[in-house]
Amino acid sequence: MGLVRSEACGLVRGSANVARRTLLSRILACTLTAAGVLAAPAAAQKRAPHRFNLPLARDLAADAAASARDRVPIFLFFDRYDCPYCERALARFVVPMAKEAPWRDRALFRQVEIDQPLPVVDFAGNATTHERLAARYGVSVTPTVAVVDGRGNVIGKPVVGLLTADFYAAYLEQAIDAGIGRLRGTTG
């Protein structure tokens, strides 16, 4: 048997059929790999959301303008799809708070999905994703709440984890109050 030269395969021992099979198997492997890479983000986007959710962070630059105008902080709830504590925090505390007077008027409530490549405009007006935004804040534990100003600076102590459920609402209220105080210059 002689050597067969193929541009895609290099030198292959055997007949032209072996070269064709090798070439086809490489094309198939590349195609399947590409299909898997392309399908992964689509599959991630198709996952069912939690039953209770805040408005997703989509345009934080616009939220920053509203924050400055109304002199209220931005409440970022960092969440993960498979986090049962996030579901509990959203259902029992965060979503009711966001809908309830006076809290709905004291902060802009936004949700950030740390395990999703969802598009978002950051505070500087740059396109990024929820995953990258969470990484910028160093968030790896969920749920995490960060109260931020219109530049995206954390202005209150972050609330990490569900902590003690009996006191969770109080921790959230303290974080919002501290953020309002910092924005309005009434606390240090």
PLM ranges: what are they?
Residues P102-A127:
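Thiol-based oxidoreductase modules, predominantly thioredoxin-like and allied folds used
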Residues E87-A101:
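Typically the conserved alpha-helix immediately C-terminal to a functionally engaged Cys/Sec
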Residues V141, V147-I180:
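Non-catalytic, surface beta->alpha helical segment in thiol-disulfide oxidoreductase systems
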Residues L56-V72:
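A short beta-strand-turn-helix
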Residues A39-K46:
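Boundary at the C-terminal end of the N-terminal hydrophobic targeting segment
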Residues M1-T22, I27-G36:
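N-terminal secretory signal peptides
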Residues E131-A146:
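Structural micro-motif
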Residues R71-D82:
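Short active-site neighborhood of thiol/selenol oxidoreductases, capturing the structured segment around
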